[in-house]
Structure formats: structure tokens, C-alpha cells
Amino acid sequence: MVDLVYSIMGDPEEIIPLSCSSGLDGTTAEDFGMAVFKYKNGVSFAKSTAVEIGGFERRQLVVVGTKGTVELCPFEWLSNGRNDDFSPQITEVREAFSGNWHQKGERHFSPEHGRYDGMFRAFADYVNGVKTNPYAYEYERKLHKILLKACGE
């Protein structure tokens, strides 16, 4: 999730880590991860926890700007009802581009797809020299530093 924020918004001016322990079943480790990323023109946040009942159904990416909003929710969903990493996924996209703040927007659904299919195809293309990896070493290094700050390091 942090890589999505970074790829969309760029380098944050400030990172505020807000991770904590839910205390569920006596857990003392930080199992609720959250960070706020402050920018000159806005704020982004990323949150993840395995203890939120029904949370998988609400996995989402929302991008809000002055010209509209795009929401992917659920971010990926098990279209066959199985709970495994390789079952087909679907994504719903809602777009609203209007001055009307109450507009519900247009809804689109992705075709079924494997959760990692695109990533593995792209990786194979990079390894075989078909495509150039768009993520340079410096990008990966900066992302790693941002991730560490988001974790409170």
C-alpha cells in the first residue's frame, strides 16, 4: 500500500507512523499498521490490519483530487468464494468527475484475473529483456526508506 501512495503522490514532506497493538488474544505486537503521509497539497494514509472483521471486503484505494474521485473497492475480491491467494479476483471501480459533490459516479467491474498474474508476467518480461523495469534502484531505495519511516524506524 505504501508503494501505491508513493507512486501516486511522490515524496511526502512528513510521515507520521500510527501503528499499535490491538491487544486481541493477548497480542502485544503491533498488528494494526497505519501511517499518515503529509504533502504540500494534501494528506494520504495507509492502514492495514488482520483483526478487522470484514476488512477484506473493504480493501480499497481511493484517489481524490480537485477534478474527481476514483475508488477501487473492493481492491480485489475472491470471485469464486474461495479464500486462497490464487483464486480469481475482481475489482470494482467507481469514478466521479463532476462539480456535483453528491454524484454517485460510474461503476465498472474488472474481468476475473489472478491476483499475481500481471506482476509475474511483467517480471518475466523484465528478466527476458522484453521490457525495461520501470522501478530504478533509486526509486526502490527511496521507497524502502519511506516504508521504514512509516513503520516508526
Language-model regions: role of each:
Residues 22, 107-111, 129-133:
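Active-site rim elements
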Residues 10-14, 42, 68, 132, ...:
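Generic structural signal for secondary-structure transition and capping sites
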Residues 25-29, 39-119:
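NAD(P)-dinucleotide binding in Rossmann-like oxidoreductases
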Residues 1-58, 138-141:
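Rossmann-like dinucleotide-binding domain that binds NAD(P)(H)
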